Amino acid sequence: PSSAASDVYKRQLLISVDSPERGIELYASELYKADRAYREYVTAWRRAHPEARSVDTDLQESYRSYQHALGQAWQMQVDKLERWSFKGVDAQSDFYEREISPVVGAKKKIAVIVSDALRYEAAQELAERINRENRFSTDLKKQYGVLPSYTQLGMAALLPHDPSSAHDSLAFGKDHYGVLVDGRSATGTENRDAILGDVGGKAIQAGELLKMKSIDVKALYRSCNVLYVYHNVIDAHGDSDKTEDEVFDSCETTFRELTDVVKKLAGGNVNNMIITSDHGFLYQGFDLDDSEWLSTQPQGDEVWVKKRRFTIGSRLAPDRAFITFTAAQAGLDDPDGEGVTIQIPNSIMRLRKQGTGSHYVHGGSALPEIVVPVLHVSK
């Protein structure tokens, strides 16, 4: 749009997004549609012009100004937060307690399918596709994700942990990147299976499940109260700079594979399922302007982890270019008193660093990164 049109747009967003809770509400009810329309357009364009490196410039520009307008409006609300928490909005870190405990407590069973980086707008389309199967009904809800919005922390947040303990039960491990749930590593299927074992649960990879005969799926489901099925296609492509621009094609693959997982589970007598994810993502199929890169770098006692959209360190110095949260403000534990701090570049800004792509990113606090789907599927 012309700059006049985009100014009107920006004002409209600033007026509408008038509280942190309202921002999440608005994204989940309306604003996600812009991200979906962009994904559908880019997918269609690339099919029609396989040789073209970049997508139609006008579209890119209008999507860029939309992302910036929303990013700024949302940032104004995030800046007001004392801690990473939203009144009356379900939290990803309460997922097990809220969605699974009551089911298991009532002596019923449930399966949870966790698809890495299945963002909210994609889950909306997935729900429509599952509904077309005519054997299932779906109900899509939202929850706000953990911060930083990256795989290890999001995956850990979805597991059973003790929300009533005096300390927050999620903490970074020794490498300050892997995550501990009540002191145990939550990295990888094996460790997650062990944590789920405490509540009579099991974990399996989607690829493994899809190869099973239905009699074996029945036996597996009979043997546990809750079954977690892990799926990773979107993030596997998005996180590599060689394949990040295939991320929308991976959404298509994901819709097909998750529909197959749902059918496979249903054939194994699973009537009750939830599809969710660890985090969402931001994607733009064009190179970033200089203005979209932060000129600042994080400073502090120590910088342990630096990614495009977040930094984890010790006593990081507050800076206007970032939002800065202590572990406690982010709902995390700091068991060794290391002054754990996280910093997130404002709006949709990226940090400069060597390697890794910049079109597909996550880890920050932007709405497409942190509004996480909770899709109930019943047979």
Predicted regions and their residues:
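Single conserved hydrophobic/aromatic residue that forms the stacking wall/gate
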Residues: 1-5, 9
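Low-complexity, highly charged intrinsically disordered N-terminal segments
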Residues: 18-82
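Active-site nucleophile/metal-coordination loop of metallo-enzymes that catalyze phosphate/sulfate
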Residues: 86-106, 120-214, 329-340, 350, ...
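Beta-strand elements within well-structured catalytic alpha/beta cores of enzymes
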Residues: 107-126, 227-230, 265, 271-283, ...
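Short secondary-structure boundary/capping segments
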Residues: 126-133, 242-248, 283-301
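Active-site neighborhoods of enzymes that stabilize oxyanions during catalysis
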Residues: 139, 233-234, 290-291, 296-379
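Active-site regions of oxyanion-processing enzymes, predominantly non-cytosolic
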Residues: 216-233
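A long, amphipathic alpha-helix that forms part
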Residues: 239-273
